Amino acid sequence: MSNVKLRIENIVASVDLFTQLNLERVIEMCPHSKYNPEEFPGIICRFDEPKVALLIFSSGKLVVTGAKSVEDIERAVNKLIQMLKKIGAKFSRAPQIDIQNMVFSGDIGMEFNLDAVALSLPNCEYEPEQFPGVIYRVKEPRAVILLFSSGKIVCSGAKSEHDAWEAVRKLLRELEKYDLIGEGEEEEW
């Protein structure tokens, strides 16, 4: 179990640029973008480097998604700010970036009988006709972990890598408590 790693699959952040934006001007500066105000009130902009998508609103608020690191989000926001400065946008202060959701994947390294897991663990759901994994909810830190019979996991809802690890540790402690994994294995994490 000591070789278990969590890999970031996606980070979603909300950003406030603290400025109003003229989206008709912004769309001219953003390659790989789409703006149809009758369908959606913002610009959908894609960057190749870093590889992210941005939703840009006239309020100066953004949603950045698809990032694999917090640094990617910061780089994308700074890249957009440099583009916006070219069309005369003024910024009263540094952007505020708030991580909304981080999604991680990982592998516990052993197979599970999901029926036994669902019958033993509190705070979980298992409807194999609807979804092939156990949905385990962690209250603090708030996160949802999907556990599959292969031992693969997906952790979503965490606001940081630390929170994701803490949520996974809680799942492992519960699995150990109900004798669903061997004792002591979780300690190697």
Swiss-Prot record:
Sequence repeats lie at residues 8-84, 99-175. It holds the Pfam family TBP. SUPFAM superfamilies: TATA-box binding protein-like (SSF55945). It comes from the Archaea. The keyword Acyltransferase does not apply. One of its GO terms (molecular function) is DNA binding. Keywords: DNA-binding, Repeat, Transcription, Transcription regulation. GO terms for biological process: DNA-templated transcription initiation. PROSITE patterns: TFIID. Belongs to the TBP family. General factor that plays a role in the activation of archaeal genes transcribed by RNA polymerase. Binds specifically to the TATA box promoter element which lies close to the position of transcription initiation. HAMAP family: TATA_bind_prot_arch. This is TATA-box-binding protein. It comes from Thermococcus celer.
